[in-house]
Amino acid sequence: MPILRSATSTQGRNMAGARALWRATGMKENDFGKPIIAVVNSFTQFVPGHVHLRDMGKLVAEQIEAAGGVAKEFNTIAVDDGIAMGHGGMLYSLPSRDLIADSVEYMVNAHCADAMVCISNCDKITPGMLMAAMRLNIPAVFVSGGPMEAGKTKLSDQLIKLDLVDAMMKSADKTVCDDDVDAIEKSACPTCGSCSGMFTANSMNCLTEALGLSLPGNGSMLATHADRKELFLTAGRQIVELCKRYYEQDDASVLPRSIATKAAFENAMSLDIAMGGSTNTVLHLLAAAQEAEVDFTMADIDRLSRKVPCLSKVAPNTNKYHMEDVHRAGGIMAILGELERADLLHSDTRTVLGMTIGEQIAKYDITLTKDEAVHKFFRAGPAGIRTTKAFSQDCRWDTVDDDRQNGCIRSKEFAYSQDGGLAMLTGNIALDGCIVKTAGVDESILKFTGDAIVFESQEEAVEGILGGKVRAGHVVIIRYEGPKGGPGMQEMLYPTTYLKSIGLGKECALLTDGRFSGGTSGLSIGHCSPEAASGGTIGLVRDGDKIAIDIPNRSIQLLVSDEELAVRRAEQDTKGWKPANRQREVSMALKMFGHFATSADKGAVRDKTKL
């Protein structure tokens, strides 16, 4: 029978000093012997996805205390990728993921916490906490802040839905007048919450449902809706139940590694492919799997991508639907239900509610249940009122969207495409693979051959795109932006956005060893591995080289002979694998990250051979 970890600091005469300090935090005599549960919050006023989380920890803590636990809250950092985008701040985004994982480990292990509730929301915070949960393997429940409502404004007397990417793209489009840009900027992000499309933050919060570590509705229920409050209350109660099952009943099935098995990781990846989620999720799932000691690799992702169809298209892959529409269509339980009926889901994986994922689908899939409470839950919709307050409205759609032929979520029979929303490509330029979000690629360019135009940094690429150097038919190469080469593996949202803004979104491809924002669409191929700084072939490309991309056949080839590549490699070995003429100030913290980082095909985690 496992004993409470917290007993290390609360039991025995020799812990009188520690108990004295615990008492100074507010603990009473009868609290010693109860499970101490870390409430891992990430409130910050820097990030709209986290600006409303200040009071969420208190909600969770009250339920923990009422159920017989002791709640102790602490905060992690949180970087806003959108605000950090397009300048040196983006170098810090991915490294913050690992820093968050470490900080959670430090706090939980230093204070011998017995379990944790992870209150996350945005791009690197959920993955960082997920890595920590897998590493620590103590009872854990995830509950996120929820998605932002989609922006809405009138342009040319037509009501349109908006998000962050629209503001970025229109500002770079010289045909859009200043008044329209101003209207879009002021309407694109109307409420608290993670940005309203299927970008990285929302993708990751959806994947925690598929992994079994969060509650139904976690990924799709709006941050502003009153119904979301119940997710926090339930998380507080449920974590105490998980503690009892583990520490009092010796039931290890409630631990994160028992829930997030390889089958669960496959479920999460299948969901990601089916909903056309962010390519960043590949990076984060690979990293979390390594922390969980689960053998889940790019080969598994490739296998799944060849059989899972695209069942949902949401911004940025379409302007028609945002996360509020996914929720109306039944949320993640509905997509998982369609995967289950297509025999593309492991239905026997477990969840933090103590059910199998199959049992959870039966209870919460709106096409299977007549339960009015469930249907009411998924009718929760936007209010259209600017606010930074959680639970500030209780508006509802008149009906759910259960149209699986033409609605937001489709059945396999009526899928947006039988080919999934994400694909892994391999070839001589990406021996260990690269990733493309196929849900955002126009059918006309699923096969594309063009001339390379090479840039040694994101900044140089942006200058080249806006300066007219990039033309139709080019394959834009942005290299030395990988985990090592950046260092930090920047997102390339500005280059892809600017290509669209000048009318080249369907006329060019982009290949990088960096990564993309979840807001990216188009023929944008990232995570090229090995990266240039690790001697990857992308570092050998020269202007004018032909590159052939074939998404249906999962191939990407640099059309240069092996003999020529061998000559170039010998020359580059002599010069060193570093960018030519790039001026970039790199801090000691970033140098440390780059020194230990692996390439993207390994999740950009630390290279343990260097420890």
Swiss-Prot record:
Keywords: 2Fe-2S, Amino-acid biosynthesis, Branched-chain amino acid biosynthesis, Iron, Iron-sulfur, Lyase, Magnesium, Metal-binding. It comes from the Bacteria. It catalyses: (2R)-2,3-dihydroxy-3-methylbutanoate = 3-methyl-2-oxobutanoate + H2O; (2R,3R)-2,3-dihydroxy-3-methylpentanoate = (S)-3-methyl-2-oxopentanoate + H2O. Pathway: Amino-acid biosynthesis; L-isoleucine biosynthesis; L-isoleucine from 2-oxobutanoate: step 3/4; Amino-acid biosynthesis; L-valine biosynthesis; L-valine from pyruvate: step 3/4. Binds 1 [2Fe-2S] cluster per subunit. This cluster acts as a Lewis acid cofactor. Functions in the biosynthesis of branched-chain amino acids. Catalyzes the dehydration of (2R,3R)-2,3-dihydroxy-3-methylpentanoate (2,3-dihydroxy-3-methylvalerate) into 2-oxo-3-methylpentanoate (2-oxo-3-methylvalerate) and of (2R)-2,3-dihydroxy-3-methylbutanoate (2,3-dihydroxyisovalerate) into 2-oxo-3-methylbutanoate (2-oxoisovalerate), the penultimate precursor to L-isoleucine and L-valine, respectively. Belongs to the IlvD/Edd family. NCBIfam families: ilvD, PRK12448.1. This is Dihydroxy-acid dehydratase. The gene is ilvD.
